[in-house]
């Protein structure tokens, strides 16, 4: 009998999350322990999720019972930039359901988070994985792990046919597939398959639990929330990106040096990304807009600053599949180092399955609105049109 795609648990433990949530959480503990934030769920493809509300609430109750184990803490202790006080804090951490509101409003499912940033930050990824798997259990109950493995093997076969041995030797790819995965069981099977048989260079996973279980490197630095929160954490709005980068540098002293460019827009980011930051950070991550236009812009910026682009890395993570990644790799080969983070294309690709397009984004910090504009208009998010208008004015965004 074929192995079901679904196991009893959806979220396995506290480490079943993206690594950058932990790196940001440590920075919040050390720098902004009293910051208050609000988050809002959004389903970009307008799917009706009301039917799944009871199951989602049941999973929230399960989350509240999770505690990190001594073995998991020991794994984190081996990561040199995670500080002892942060490890101790994680040992005490519990998900608190009082910070989560769910229900139906205007005939639509809603989910909101409100509370201390330090205690809310870890909710995002498991919530998204829960909602995705609850919906998939209802819509695709007969799905099997073998279907995911077969799709993965087809992709490997395609890459072997299309790419030369020389190209494969430098084609670096990581799993970024936790938040919109079809199910945990599929996710584990996919990452195991990538480790064992990926034709290029599989460099690790963003999922901390799977990194520990499968002896892989956990990957990730910062997300949009880090830059968004700084819009209301004290500095002048025009200085918020610089303040976010500077705080990151002080926290990690040159480690975890991949910065995200599109919180406002890449043009606005590069105006703040001066020689100081460009030397300190190892590279940049692309998450919206045309990837090759973005790459040309960032390469030109490094050259203008007198920095050899071949000493820097560009990470691409915006809705990638292998054909898109290979196209980008070929266009930039020999000009700058590149790496790819692929998510849904690997972890939610089964026959007949339509992946969800869901996000949980920060909407306010310390009682005031924050915004993400991005290089793709459809990815913009802000609940206050006046604030986003002001933000565009301050950063000279059309």
UniProtKB/Swiss-Prot annotation:
Q: Briefly state the modifications made to the protein after translation.
A: Transiently phosphorylated on a His residue during the reaction cycle. Phosphorylation strongly increases the affinity for substrates and increases the rate of nicotinate D-ribonucleotide production. Dephosphorylation regenerates the low-affinity form of the enzyme, leading to product release.
Quote the EC number.
6.3.4.21
Q: Name one GO biological process term.
A: NAD biosynthetic process via the salvage pathway
Q: Which UniProt keywords apply?
A: Ligase, Phosphoprotein, Pyridine nucleotide biosynthesis
Q: Which reaction does it catalyse?
A: nicotinate + 5-phospho-alpha-D-ribose 1-diphosphate + ATP + H2O = nicotinate beta-D-ribonucleotide + ADP + phosphate + diphosphate
Q: What class of enzyme is it?
A: ligase
For the modification Phosphohistidine, the affected residues are 224
Alphabetized Pfam families for the sequence: NAPRTase, NAPRTase_N
CDD domains xrefs: PncB_like
Q: Per the record's keyword annotation, is Ligase included, yes or no?
A: yes
* Entry protein name: Nicotinate phosphoribosyltransferase 2
Look up and give the organism this protein is from.
Pseudomonas aeruginosa (strain ATCC 15692 / DSM 22644 / CIP 104116 / JCM 14847 / LMG 12228 / 1C / PRS 101 / PAO1)
Identify the coding gene: pncB2
């Amino acid at each position: 009998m074929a192995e079901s795609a679904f196991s009893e648990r959806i979220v396995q433990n506290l480490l079943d999350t993206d690594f950058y949530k932990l790196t940001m959480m440590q920075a919040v503990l050390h720098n902004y322990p009293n910051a208050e934030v609000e988050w809002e769920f959004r389903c970009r493809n307008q799917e009706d999720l009301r039917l799944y509300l009871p199951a989602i609430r049941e999973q929230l109750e399960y989350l509240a019972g999770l505690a990190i184990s001594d073995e998991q803490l020991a794994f984190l202790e081996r990561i040199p930039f995670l500080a002892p006080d942060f490890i101790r804090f994680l040992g005490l951490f519990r998900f608190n359901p009082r910070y989560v509101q769910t229900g139906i409003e205007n005939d639509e499912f809603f989910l909101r988070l409100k509370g201390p940033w330090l205690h809310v930050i870890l909710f995002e990824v498991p919530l998204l994985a829960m909602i995705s798997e609850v919906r998939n259990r209802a819509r695709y109950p007969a799905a099997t792990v073998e279907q995911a493995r077969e799709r993965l093997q087809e992709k490997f076969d395609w890459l072997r046919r299309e790419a030369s041995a020389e190209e494969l030797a430098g084609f670096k790819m990581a799993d970024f597939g936790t938040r919109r995965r079809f199910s945990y069981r599929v996710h584990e099977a996919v990452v195991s398959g990538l480790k064992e048989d990926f034709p290029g260079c599989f460099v690790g996973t963003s999922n901390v639990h799977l990194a520990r279980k499968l002896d892989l490197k956990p990957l990730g630095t910062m997300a949009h929330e880090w830059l968004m929160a700084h819009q209301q954490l004290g500095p002048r709005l025009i200085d918020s990106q610089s303040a976010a980068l500077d705080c990151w540098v002080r926290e990690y002293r040159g480690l975890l040096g991949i910065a995200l460019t599109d919180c406002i827009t890449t043009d606005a980011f590069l105006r703040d990304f001066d020689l100081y930051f460009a030397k300190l950070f190892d590279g940049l991550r692309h998450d919206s807009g045309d990837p090759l236009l973005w790459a040309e812009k960032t390469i030109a910026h490094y050259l203008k600053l007198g920095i050899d682009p071949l000493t820097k890395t560009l990470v691409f993570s915006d809705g990638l599949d292998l054909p898109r990644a290979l196209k980008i790799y070929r266009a930039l080969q020999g000009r700058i180092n590149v790496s790819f983070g692929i998510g849904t294309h690997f972890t939610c690709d089964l026959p007949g399955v339509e992946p969800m397009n869901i996000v949980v984004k920060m909407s306010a910090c310390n009682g005031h609105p924050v915004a993400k504009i991005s290089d793709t208009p459809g990815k913009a998010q802000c609940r206050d049109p006046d604030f986003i208008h002001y933000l565009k004015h301050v950063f000279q965004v059309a």
